[in-house]
Structures are given as C-alpha cells and as structure tokens.
C-alpha cells in the first residue's frame, strides 16, 4: 500500500465512524528514514481531528476510539501515529 492510499483509508474510516468537522492526515515518515527501525512498508502518521463528538471526551478515550477504528491499519501499515484533537 502506498501512502496516498493509506491516507485516503484513514480519512474515510474516521469520517464514516465519527462526526468530524475536519480531518488532516499527514505523512511524517521522512523524519524517520535514518532510524534503525525504519521500514518502507510502515508509515509515520500525524492526524488532526476536529470533532464535536470527541471534543468533550478525555484525550485517552478519544485516542482509544481512533485506535479501534484504525486497528487494521495500525497493525499492518503504521509504525507511529500521533493524534491531535480540537
């Protein structure tokens, strides 16, 4: 899977599962290319979610929700994930 496919899947799965006002998914893999653990088939992702539904939840609760939505992608394609909520 390439990064553009992964970004589209992430956006769709989150948008289909949670009411979001906006979602931004960024590839940050380039920041880690020289790390010993770097693999071409695993990506470093930053997600920024603006959601009324998640806004009033504790950050750990909101993070668990997103992790459960992206469970397969995290197992297979994501090495590192950062999630920010508005």
Predicted regions and their residues:
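N-terminal, polar/charged subdomain of small-to-medium soluble alpha/beta proteins
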Residues: 1-86
């Amino acid at each position: 899977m390439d990064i553009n496919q992964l970004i589209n899947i992430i956006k769709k799965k989150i948008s289909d599962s949670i009411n979001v006002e906006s979602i931004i998914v960024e590839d940050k893999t380039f920041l880690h290319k020289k790390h010993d653990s770097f693999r071409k088939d695993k990506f470093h992702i930053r997600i920024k979610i603006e959601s009324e539904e998640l806004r009033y939840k504790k950050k750990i609760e909101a993070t668990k929700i997103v992790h459960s939505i992206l469970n397969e992608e995290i197992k297979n394609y994501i090495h590192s994930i950062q999630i920010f909520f508005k």
